[in-house]
Amino acid sequence: MSGPADAEPVFAEQLGSDDPLERAQAALDLALYYLDRGFAPAGKTRAFLKARDIVGEIGSEDLRSRVAAGTLTDLAGIGPSTGSVISDAVDRRPSRYLADLASATVQDVGSGGGIRSLLRGDLHSHTFWSDGSESVATMARSARALGHEYLAVTDHSARLTVAHGLDEARLSEQLTEIEALNAELAPFRILTGMEVDILEDGRLDLSSEMLSRLDVVVASVHSKLAMDEREMTRRMVMAVADPDVDVLGHCTGRKITGRGRPPSRFDADIVFAACARFDTAVEINCRPERRDPPEELTALALEWGCRVSIDTDAHAPGQLEWQAWGCGFAADMGIDPERIINTYPADELLGWTAAHPTA
């Protein structure tokens, strides 16, 4: 990934459309991109999502008439901010709101510019197949606009019902969709994948037959986070020892924003020794509320010789830019880029995922 990140190519065609409705929707999408990039409060994001739905319902001529008459904000659900973005797009004016939002949400790579230039993709992302906010196609096009060569789509497995996790039938449908999109987007590649739940006994929430069909498997703990340290250690080791698992996701499960959540307790030496033994990468999760693992555990994973993956865990296109933090963190930790698996070209990466040792 080289050069500055730029979201606008994803929306450029619609922003330049002759149809005022398409321009308005693209401008709202761009606002949502920046809001997601800036980890905006959910209420703000919902306001723009609602405005996008409202605009889609009223049609081009009604929209143009309301903007001309200054009555756009008379519509329930259209406020001053959303109204200004829509009106500027309809009238083909530069949007001060979008410009300010873009400036305020730039992601600082810090000392990680060198690592960022070497990254070729992101191995942890979600779409509306589970709890993401956008389609596979939109996430992929956004990743491509950021300079990525590939994006792994890793929606949740069925056990995580709160996130509308995929059972095997729905996952098979998604694989068919990805196959068609790859034909359209080549040479960019959407890698098939899943963030599979590590069950309480260490088993994975997907059959080995289905796991073997996937390009990238991220295994994560989402339940019983406060279980006994010894049992959690056993649970995690069983998962990373599975040759179908490529990445151990957000290993402590901590949350560091809002009400927060303490990290799970496990014997990190044993878990990271297993990651090194079975060549399973430890994820550096870039989500602002996670940023997991912390420095001391990252250092320990490196001491054990683990590979790492710098991933956003993005649930929306703008969140794909959160890799900037992870690159800075990796640089500050002195991580050799050769140990970062998403610096590998796609074919080399897939060769690695297919070659994990067995017990």
Named regions from a protein language model:
Residues 2-112:
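Long, highly charged, low-complexity intrinsically disordered interaction regions
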Residues 2-20, 73, 84, 95-119, ...:
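Charged catalytic cores and adjacent phosphate/nucleic-acid-binding surfaces used
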Residues 76-77, 121, 152, 310:
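Short conserved micro-motifs on helix faces and helix-strand junctions that flank
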Residues 123-128, 150-154:
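Ser/Thr-glycine-rich phosphate-binding loops at phosphate-binding pockets of nucleotides
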Residues 190-192:
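Short beta-strand elements
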